[in-house]
Amino acid sequence: HLEVAAHLYGPDDGKPVIALHGWLDNAATFSRLAPRLQGLRIVALDLPGHGHSDHRPIGAGYNIWDYAHDVLQVAEQFGWQRFSLLGHSMGAIVSVLLAGALPERVERLALIDGVIPYTGEADSAPQKLGSALEALLAVNDKRKPVYASFDQAVEARMKGVGAVSREAAEMLAQRGLMPVPGGYTWRTDPRLMLPSAMRLTRAHALAFVSRVACPTSLVLAEQGLMMQPELLELVESFPFDIRRLAGGHHLHLDDDIGAEAVARVFNSFLHD
């Protein structure tokens, strides 16, 4: 079995919510937002391969749908037959996949700047698998970067995928870094950087969205990753309550103003 770490927020008898972070992040992504959400029992996970959770065994991969199984295992452990999901970025995508696959288990979806995975059409699948296999052969030669100081690691994270504020990078780093000879490195499994062997097609992804049966609130960041016109048009056709808020991809973590704005949307939504 895999050991999965989590940060718990809110009263034991609060409404059950499982919170899922984005790719290469960890549970600390919710450290500004979660305390502002009232009356909820929030289990903010470090997904496998991230933060303090175990890495998947040798030979296993990190397909996005495997995280849906991890979430269900956690729900089983808490005895939660029905629960809500709070997801950011990749965590929002996993939330939609799970809510589409098992609509009877999910009560509400609260999503931040993420909905459907990167898709790939059938004709590109052989090349995609080829690149993934080659990357897999080379993975053992890859070394994770070592940063001489905590600050250097924070600086690097500020410029990483979905740039974040210094405070946000510090919060992610406090949970995500570990000391090694010569400084610090991220706890994340280097295999998370491998390209996907298979992608869902656009039709696959939309089929999951169409099977979501619960109320869904989606916060889009004005300076986030979902502002391309084509993607925006697609997302605005979904039967979700959509709010656009000022801020970048990590608007819920970058500063108190962003966290407060997201909390206002989700507090009323999760208690309707």
What are these regions (language model features)?
Residues 141-199:
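Conserved alpha/beta-hydrolase catalytic His-Asp/Glu region
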Residues 2, 43-86:
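Active-site loop/oxyanion-hole signature of alpha/beta-hydrolase fold enzymes
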Residues 1-17, 38-41, 80-81, 116, ...:
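Alpha/beta-hydrolase fold catalytic core
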Residues 7-55:
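Conserved HGGG/HGGXW glycine-rich cap/lid loop of the alpha/beta-hydrolase fold
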Residues 80-124:
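Conserved hydrolase catalytic core segment
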Residues 112-146:
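A catalytic-pocket lid/entrance helix-loop region that shapes and gates access to the active site
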Residues 247-259:
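Catalytic histidine-centered segment of alpha/beta-hydrolase-like enzymes
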Residues 178-235:
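Conserved serine/cysteine hydrolase catalytic core
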